């Protein structure tokens, strides 16, 4: 068995079930946050502006507008053990794979809903 096959087998065992989502979708990511000896789950909701990588190293970027109208982006590894679950809140219809133009737009941008 070659090293490449071994890596693929290990990657396959690490993968967990995640819902299918694309850039433009609004998702709610439940993240496990460890504070001292306690652990709690924090929800982070926003628009997926990019998905990159493949396999176990796949990541996605979620952007949301926090209090005061400041945009906050967070990059999540898709198969990280700190992610409890991912919910798709609404499906957006966009024509780009990377929605970096949303960084320059002030206020809330309306993304058309996908049926």
From Swiss-Prot:
GO terms for biological process: translation. It holds the Pfam family Ribosomal_L19. One of its GO terms (cellular component) is cytosolic large ribosomal subunit. Keywords: Ribonucleoprotein, Ribosomal protein. The keyword Disulfide bond does not apply. It comes from the Bacteria. Gene3D superfamilies: 2.30.30.790. One of its GO terms (molecular function) is structural constituent of ribosome. This protein is located at the 30S-50S ribosomal subunit interface and may play a role in the structure and function of the aminoacyl-tRNA binding site. Belongs to the bacterial ribosomal protein bL19 family. NCBIfam families: rplS_bact. HAMAP family: Ribosomal_bL19. This is Large ribosomal subunit protein bL19. The gene is rplS.
